[in-house]
Amino acid sequence: MGQKVNPVGLRLGINRNWTSRWFPSARTAPSNIDEDNKIRKFLKKELYYAGVSEIVIERAAKKLRVTVVAARPGLIIGKKGVDIEKVKEGLKTLIKKEVSINIKEVKRPQADAQLAAENVATQLEKRVAFRRAMKKVMQAALKSGAKGIKVRVSGRLAGAEIARTEWYMEGRVPLHTLRAKIDYGFAEAMTVYGIIGVKVWIFKGEVLQKGIQFEKKEEAKEEREPRRSRRGRQ
């Protein structure tokens, strides 16, 4: 089960929270979902250079608040807040509502799954060898404190005639363990041979109900050598 489903959706309400936070009704739910989708597409396109990891949308009464979690928040805000005002005006024109925007910084960009997936996709678009791109991202994540990482790419790799899937994994990535804090990211690389999908799973430790991360002593002692596999199925 844990190997097949989205690890974020599987852990909602356990150690992950929803990115759209509002109370739906039969009348407003469809329009709200459509608005959320438009907001995310707009911000991803306009703020791609800032390394956007997550977009959280909150609604209360007639207020709409958007929190953008990014690796380079200074590029979003701009000099004296000029750039962020342009983004607000663009959102207001798009959805015909007043929007307040909060900016948060990603503490460890190298250990963020979404940014790692986009990094691999960007390198593939620049014609970097896919194995080199994958290993580079994995090494950076492990140096930033990740307990384990798995990267998978699918498509016409290196211009091959037949599409295939290849993946690497280092450390532990326990997808079945619900208390495990698994970060997940997905991106697509638009290459001359077609679209290549990139998926990244990063294990950041186990979380108790109070939010305390821990690592079992027995597991630390019996830690196995990092596993690597170039080809395989999830």
UniProtKB/Swiss-Prot annotation:
The keyword Glycoprotein does not apply. It comes from the Bacteria. GO terms for cellular component: cytosolic small ribosomal subunit. Residues 39-107 form the KH type-2 domain. One of its GO terms (biological process) is translation. GO terms for molecular function: mRNA binding; rRNA binding; structural constituent of ribosome. Signal peptide: none annotated. Keywords: Ribonucleoprotein, Ribosomal protein, RNA-binding, rRNA-binding. Part of the 30S ribosomal subunit. Forms a tight complex with proteins S10 and S14. Belongs to the universal ribosomal protein uS3 family. Binds the lower part of the 30S subunit head. Binds mRNA in the 70S ribosome, positioning it for translation. PANTHER family: 30S/40S RIBOSOMAL PROTEIN S3 (PTHR11760), SMALL RIBOSOMAL SUBUNIT PROTEIN US3C (PTHR11760:SF19). This is Small ribosomal subunit protein uS3.
